[in-house]
């Protein structure tokens, strides 16, 4: 699976949304109806999966699925 597929699968699992609803430009709050607890749990799962810590400041900037994918790509390089 690609990074994008991995991230989308985690989002589907964590937020309980349909895979068809998870697009690169989907906003966690507006499009996927996530609340702050959902986002905290999502960040924790991403940290565990990709084995690095996401600072609170960075987490606040991750507003869309694409933001998360780009952030992880940058951290992995």
UniProtKB/Swiss-Prot annotation:
Carrier domain residues: 1-76
Family matches, as InterPro entries: ACP, ACP-like_sf, PP-bd_ACP, Ppantetheine_attach_site
Protein name (database record): Acyl carrier protein
O-(pantetheine 4'-phosphoryl)serine sites (modified residues): 36
Top-level division of the source organism's lineage: Bacteria
Function of the molecule: Carrier of the growing fatty acid chain in fatty acid biosynthesis.
MF-aspect GO terms: acyl binding; acyl carrier activity
Compartment annotation: Cytoplasm
Pathway, per record: Lipid metabolism; fatty acid biosynthesis
Recorded name of the encoding gene: acpP
Coiled-coil intervals, chain numbering: none
Gene Ontology CC terms, in alphabetical order: cytosol; membrane
Organism of origin: Chlamydia trachomatis serovar D (strain ATCC VR-885 / DSM 19411 / UW-3/Cx)
Keyword annotations: Cytoplasm, Fatty acid biosynthesis, Fatty acid metabolism, Lipid biosynthesis, Lipid metabolism, Phosphopantetheine, Phosphoprotein
Family stated for the protein in its record: Belongs to the acyl carrier protein (ACP) family.
Gene Ontology biological process terms in this record: lipid A biosynthetic process
PTM text: 4'-phosphopantetheine is transferred from CoA to a specific serine of apo-ACP by AcpS. This modification is essential for activity because fatty acids are bound in thioester linkage to the sulfhydryl of the prosthetic group.
């Amino acid at each position: 699976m690609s990074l994008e597929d991995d991230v989308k699968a985690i989002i589907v699992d964590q937020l309980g949304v349909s895979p068809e609803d998870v697009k690169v430009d989907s906003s966690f709050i507006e499009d996927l109806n996530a609340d702050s607890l959902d986002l905290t749990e999502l960040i924790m799962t991403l940290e565990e999966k990709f084995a690095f810590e996401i600072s609170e400041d960075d987490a606040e900037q991750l507003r869309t699925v694409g933001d998360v994918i780009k952030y992880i790509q940058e951290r992995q390089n």
